[in-house]
């Protein structure tokens, strides 16, 4: 908080400890959840990003939304992207869940309405009356490439203009240089 952090985006694909270890390739779910609770206590706004996948975590779609709505956290479902090993048709097709599939599943438990979003938003945002919001980043169902204004900095110092493209620029040296 003293550093000026006002908001965090956290990737969390499940509330199941075993599944968490599989998807995250290690780590401890309880530590992540305690960290989320602590950030909320400090007044830091949180958005949680989940990539729903048919075989890996489909049963977590509603429980994670429940968790987020109970805490005033906006959950962003992100459609699976064709990246890395997921670029293989067989893997991608067995795991991909469309925006409509997500809306249908959420609709079994919640009423919701689509809300207006800023022009440069990558998410389609929905309001659950009296509960909160969730969003869907539907890069496959509703591509937004022409209006995307995002740049991404990887943990190893590369700047990406698009997650669907392998083009990147190393800026790690610039980030590491002290400023006057």
Each PLM stretch: what is its role?
Residues 1-76:
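Radical SAM/AdoMet-radical enzyme domain recognition
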Residues 13, 80, 156:
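Flexible loop residues that form catalytic
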Residues 51-55, 82, 92:
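Short histidine/acidic/glycine/proline-rich micro-motifs that form metal-
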Residues 74-79, 159-160:
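Short, compositionally biased low-complexity segments
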Residues 84-180:
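Accessory C-terminal segments flanking Radical SAM cores
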């Amino acid at each position: 908080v003293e550093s000026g952090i006002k908001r965090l985006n956290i990737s969390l694909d499940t509330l199941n400890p075993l599944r968490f270890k599989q998807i995250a390739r290690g780590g401890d779910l309880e530590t992540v959840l305690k960290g989320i609770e602590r950030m909320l206590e400090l007044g830091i706004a949180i958005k949680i990003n989940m990539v729903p996948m048919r075989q890996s975590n489909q049963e977590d779609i509603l429980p994670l939304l429940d968790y987020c709505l109970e805490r005033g956290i906006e959950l962003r479902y992100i459609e699976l992207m064709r990246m890395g090993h997921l670029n293989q048709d067989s893997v991608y097709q067995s795991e991909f869940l469309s925006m409509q599939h997500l809306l249908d599943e959420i609709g079994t438990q919640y009423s919701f309405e689509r809300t207006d979003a800023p022009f440069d938003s990558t998410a389609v945002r929905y309001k659950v009356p009296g509960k909160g919001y969730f969003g869907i980043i539907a890069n496959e169902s509703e591509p937004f490439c022409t209006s995307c204004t995002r740049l991404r900095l990887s943990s190893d110092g590369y700047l990406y203009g698009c997650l669907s493209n392998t083009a990147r620029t190393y800026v790690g040296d610039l980030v590491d240089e002290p400023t006057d």
